[in-house]
Amino acid sequence: MDVTDELRTRVRGLIQAMPGAQRDFAAGIGLDETKLSKALSGARRFSAGELVRIAEYSGVTVNWLLNGSDEAKTVTAVPAPAARSIRVPTDLEPRRRILETAWQLIAERGYHRVRVADIAKACGTSTATIHHYFPTKTEVLNEALRRNVKLAFDRQVAELHAVQDAHQRLLRLVELQLPKDGLLRDEWSVWLQVWNESAINPKIRSLYWDSYDRWYNTIAMTIRSGQEQGVFRVRDPDKATAQLTALIDGLGIQVLTGRPGSSVAAMREHLHDFIDQNIAAKPVR
C-alpha cells in the first residue's frame, strides 16, 4: 500500500468515525461530494487545501493523514507539545467556531478590545457557552494560538511534502509566510499583538517561544537539507536561519504598519534577494 492508498484509507476511517453520512463530511470540509468520492477512489488527488480542511474538521493533523503519526518525520518541524491544541474527542465544531471567531475579532479589533461577549455575539451563542469551553479570555487566546500553530503546520506539510528540492521548498515557505490580504494578514496581525503581550506578560512567553520555535526550526532544517543537497552554500545554518527569520519579521512588520514603500511584493523581492545572495550555493542573479 503506497502513501496515497494509506491516505485514502485514513480519510475513509475518519468519515466512518464522524457522525452523519459521507455527504455530511463533504459539506463539513466545503468539498463537492462527487470530488470527495473521486479522491477516495483514486480518480483524483486531494489538494493541499483539502487536506488542511479534512485535518481541521476531523481534529487530526495533515502529518497524520499523510504519514500515520503526528510525530512522523516530515519536511517541517513538528510543534512542541506545549504549542499543540488540547485534544478534545467531542464537540470539535463548537470549539473550532469559537477559536476561529476569536482569532478573526482579535486580528480586526485588537486583543484588548475584544470581550468574551463580543466573541459570543459573533458566534451567535451565549457568554456561558464560551466559558464552558474556555473559562477565561486568556485561555481563548492561548488555545487560538495553538490552533494557529497547528494550521500553519498543516499548511506547510500539505504544500511541501512533495517538494524535494530544498531551494524551492525554502522559497515556498517564504511565500506561505507573506502577509497577504486575508488569512495570512490576519495571522500576522494577531502575532504582532502576541509579540507585544509577551514583552510585558512573562506568562505567555513560553507558549510564544514554543510556537515560534517550530517556524524557526522549519527554516533551519530546510537550510540544512539544502546544504546536504548541495543547493545551499556551506555556512552556519543557525546563523543563516537567525538572519532570514529576523528579516521576515522586520519586513512583515513594515508591511502591516504601512511603512511607505513597503508591500508584499517588495517583501518577497527582498527575501528572494537575501536567499539568492546569502544562502543559495550560487547567486541566482
Language model region names:
Residues 205, 209, 227-278, 282-285:
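Hydrophobic/aromatic-rich alpha-helical bundle segments in the mid-to-C-terminal region
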Residues 183, 202-228:
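Amphipathic alpha-helical packing segments from all-alpha helical-bundle domains
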Residues 105-139:
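Helix-turn-helix
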Residues 1-18, 87-90, 94, 103:
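A short, Lys/Arg-rich alpha-helix, primarily the initiator
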Residues 49-64:
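DNA major-groove recognition helix of helix-turn-helix/homeodomain DNA-binding modules
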Residues 44, 48, 70, 92-100, ...:
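An amphipathic alpha-helix adjacent to DNA-recognition modules
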